[in-house]
């Protein structure tokens, strides 16, 4: 009798659990995965090459569109690399605002991850819970930058503007009566800081709700415990960073090991897993939600007590104020030069990395002294994680491949660049 050979299956790029445009070629023995070959490049937009023909400030909005779930964290790394080459000092208030919004971004990312990962594994309702909180976080983005996602709020030398004193309010519409509207606008009567502090008070209970839905859920544990196990040694050898590395038991976090901005002034813990499976990585990210909430509360308290400038006063790097620009010739010249030519960065090279929600997001910048980068290299955390897809899914069932993709938290904007 003829021997039945393994057969090959295309998974994605249209599959809803492919998290974008992942194409996996799976070699199967029945329903057991023998080999997984990820194909990337379907979302390649040549960001690194485009940056070579744009001034430093013009490339900033491209950063939002790399990992389009963790927008401000991408901007953060880019600005840190430029500041390293320029030798610019960032005002402390701007550093606190950056750290606060980086943590808001971390919560945004992890909420989408927990919703999508749960949905991939059959937990249908967690997505609705997660998106309820994401709405408030997008409102914070909107209040500070005018955009709900691609904020372009960070600047080399600080941030675009200070925190606003008012919050956008829901307006009268045909589908909401006055009573419902008043309840929705209840926590929007004060400043952005008031709104953030109100969110931080409510959020721990919301995280408890997510844990009630998943943590001790028998089906969730069956789908994640013992799936995609990575030992600490293999995690290091594979280049894992972020929750993927901490889930395997290694307490490595750039916010602690190589602190940037004011991370050395805020108090938080690094959650670490023990088993290195999908369930451990889930627990690590859930605890990160709580720790990010702690950091945001500390930043909000400091910002309330310490007014000050939010961008460097070096007008060769940051534009002068509108009032000065319209009344003073020197400021007008600075403004004109910045918006036509941009600033020139001294010759040299710099690498800046941030603890992105997905891992170590790095920007390697080479300058030849011009107003545009000579070379910009992006170190995407998801790239190293996806490379381990074959090792993590081998020997598991085809349904577990979805859980492994989910636990990696991959977004193709940053992997394909």
Swiss-Prot record:
Documented EC number(s): 7.1.1.-
A GO cellular-component term linked to this record = plasma membrane
Q: Which Gene3D superfamilies match?
A: Cytochrome-c3 Hydrogenase, chain B
Is Signal one of the keywords? no
Q: Which reaction does it catalyse?
A: a quinone + NADH + 5 H(+)(in) = a quinol + NAD(+) + 4 H(+)(out)
Task: Name the membrane topology term.
Answer: Peripheral membrane protein
Q: What class of enzyme is it?
A: translocase
- InterPro entries named among the record's database cross-references: NADH_Q_OxRdtase_suD, NADH_UbQ_OxRdtase_49kDa_CS, NDH1_su_D/H, NiFe-Hase_large
Q: Which UniProt keywords apply?
A: Cell inner membrane, Cell membrane, Membrane, NAD, Quinone, Translocase, Transport, Ubiquinone
Keyword Transmembrane included in the entry's annotation: no
Report a single Gene Ontology molecular function: quinone binding
The listed locations are: Cell inner membrane
Q: Which family does it belong to?
A: Belongs to the complex I 49 kDa subunit family.
Chain's role:
NDH-1 shuttles electrons from NADH, via FMN and iron-sulfur (Fe-S) centers, to quinones in the respiratory chain. The immediate electron acceptor for the enzyme in this species is believed to be ubiquinone. Couples the redox reaction to proton translocation (for every two electrons transferred, four hydrogen ions are translocated across the cytoplasmic membrane), and thus conserves the redox energy in a proton gradient.
Assembly information from the UniProt record: NDH-1 is composed of 14 different subunits. Subunits NuoB, C, D, E, F, and G constitute the peripheral sector of the complex.
PANTHER family (UniProt xref) = NADH DEHYDROGENASE [UBIQUINONE] IRON-SULFUR PROTEIN 2, MITOCHONDRIAL, NADH-UBIQUINONE OXIDOREDUCTASE 49 KDA SUBUNIT
Full protein name: NADH-quinone oxidoreductase subunit D
Q: What is the lineage of its organism?
A: Bacteria, Pseudomonadati, Pseudomonadota, Betaproteobacteria, Burkholderiales
């Amino acid at each position: 009798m003829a021997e039945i050979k393994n057969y090959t299956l295309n998974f994605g790029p249209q599959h809803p659990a492919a998290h974008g445009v992942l194409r996996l070629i799976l070699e199967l023995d029945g329903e057991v995965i023998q080999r997984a070959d990820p194909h990337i490049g379907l979302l390649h937009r040549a960001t690194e090459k485009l940056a070579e023909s744009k001034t430093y400030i013009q490339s900033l909005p491209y950063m939002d569109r790399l990992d389009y779930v963790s927008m401000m964290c991408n901007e953060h790394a880019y600005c840190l690399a430029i500041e390293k080459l320029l030798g610019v000092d960032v005002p402390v208030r701007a550093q606190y605002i950056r750290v606060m919004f980086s943590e808001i971004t971390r919560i945004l990312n992890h909420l989408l991850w927990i919703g999508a990962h749960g949905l991939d594994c059959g937990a249908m309702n967690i997505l609705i819970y997660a998106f309820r909180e994401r709405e408030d976080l997008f409102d914070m983005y909107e209040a500070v930058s005018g955009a709900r996602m691609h904020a372009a709020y960070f600047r080399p030398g600080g941030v675009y503007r200070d925190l606003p004193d008012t919050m956008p309010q829901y307006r009268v519409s045909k589908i909401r009566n006055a009573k419902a509207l008043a309840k929705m606008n209840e926590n929007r009567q004060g400043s952005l800081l008031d709104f953030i502090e109100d969110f931080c008070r409510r959020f721990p209970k919301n995280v408890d709700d997510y844990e009630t839905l998943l943590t001790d859920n028998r089906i969730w544990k069956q789908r994640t415990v013992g799936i995609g196990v990575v030992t600490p040694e293999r995690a290091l050898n594979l280049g894992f960073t972020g929750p993927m590395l901490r889930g395997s038991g290694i307490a490595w976090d750039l916010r602690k090991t190589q602190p940037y901005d004011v991370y050395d002034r805020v108090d938080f813990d690094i959650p670490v897993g023990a088993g290195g499976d999908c369930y451990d990585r889930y627990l690590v990210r859930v605890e990160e939600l709580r720790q990010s909430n702690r950091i945001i509360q500390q930043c909000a308290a400091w910002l309330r007590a310490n007014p000050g400038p939010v961008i460097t006063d070096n007008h060769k790097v940051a534009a002068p104020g509108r009032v000065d620009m319209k009344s003073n010739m020197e400021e007008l010249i600075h403004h004109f030069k910045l918006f036509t030519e941009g600033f020139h960065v001294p010759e040299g090279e710099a690498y800046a990395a941030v603890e992105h929600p997905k891992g170590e997001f790095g920007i390697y910048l080479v300058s030849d002294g011009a107003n545009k980068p000579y070379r910009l290299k992006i170190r995407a955390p998801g790239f190293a994680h996806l490379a381990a897809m074959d090792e993590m899914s081998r020997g598991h069932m085809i349904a577990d491949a979805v859980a492994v993709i989910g636990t990696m938290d991959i977004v193709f904007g940053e992997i394909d660049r």
